[in-house]
Amino acid sequence: MQIVNISAYKFVTLEDIETLRPVMRERCDAAGLKGTILLAPEGINMFLAGTREQIDEFMAWLHADARFADIAPKESLSENQPFKRMLVRAKKEIITMKMPLIRPEAGRAPSVRPVDLKRWLDQGHDDDGRPVVMLDTRNAFEVAVGTFDKAVEYGIDKFSEFPPAVAENKAEFEGKTIVSFCTGGIRCEKAAIHMQEVGIDHVYQLEGGILKYFEEVGGSHYNGDCFVFDYRTALNPNLEPAGPVQCFACRAVVTPEEQQHPKYVVGKSCPHCVDTATQAAA
């Protein structure tokens, strides 16, 4: 049976989370879906999986709410259900930055479509002649799986480390067009809004993130695969599961080459953690 995997988010003011949460959980359970929905005062973020009929049933219900009517989820297919349970959680932020909350009523950050970004990268500048800087807003272990050519990345371990990293490097963005990007769009949108708020000009988010870029223009100007937070671990530019897997013990990304290493034991250890695991067992 083919499973439809969807991810979607929207920055929108939610003042009824206490009542919305149980209703949303009930609808997901009734549709037979599994996954996670995060609700916060600044919006919604969701990762769901089910049959085509189940997904369509839930999205029809969600779109009936004017606040969510324009949510357009990104889809991929799998042979198995990637989630074990259904969770609907109330959070302070839908993606944790530990900065003042996004003000949805102030509008979205400017975005650039994948096809336009590819054109900018092909020609070496944006439509106004400014150099384009690709800014990776993801964590270091995600970046290691793949990223855009010559992308700037700060080696962060969590998204809350992004604002101070930007503050330290703000001067480097002067006179350039900055395109923030992430897996599916949520982090790069919040990052772009933050950069605008601290006075950085000419900031865009990559519309739909890396996965939308893969879907619309393929892997041009991109090296490697895209890490995803489910059992597939990484997707190639054809949106197919790639070779890397995650180590069950330490959660590090293990490349196909590293999987051939004698220290890689499925479910127990990998070259990144085997020495630590051995010491702990001693």
Swiss-Prot record:
> What GO molecular function terms would the record report?
oxidoreductase activity, acting on paired donors, with incorporation or reduction of molecular oxygen
* Catalysed transformations (reactions): uridine(34) in tRNA + AH2 + O2 = 5-hydroxyuridine(34) in tRNA + A + H2O
User: Which residues constitute the catalytic centre?
Assistant: C182 (cysteine persulfide intermediate)
Q: Which PROSITE patterns match?
A: RHODANESE_3
> Which EC number(s) does the record attach to this protein?
1.14.-.-
Is Transmembrane helix among this UniProt entry's keywords?
A: no
All copies of domain Rhodanese, residue ranges: 128-222
Asked whether the UniProt record includes tRNA processing among its keywords, one would answer: yes
Keywords, A to Z? Oxidoreductase, tRNA processing
Q: Name one GO biological process term.
A: tRNA modification
Query: Its family?
Result: Belongs to the TrhO family.
Function statement: Catalyzes oxygen-dependent 5-hydroxyuridine (ho5U) modification at position 34 in tRNAs.
Protein name stated in the entry: tRNA uridine(34) hydroxylase
Species source reads Cupriavidus metallidurans (strain ATCC 43123 / DSM 2839 / NBRC 102507 / CH34)
Name the gene for this chain: trhO
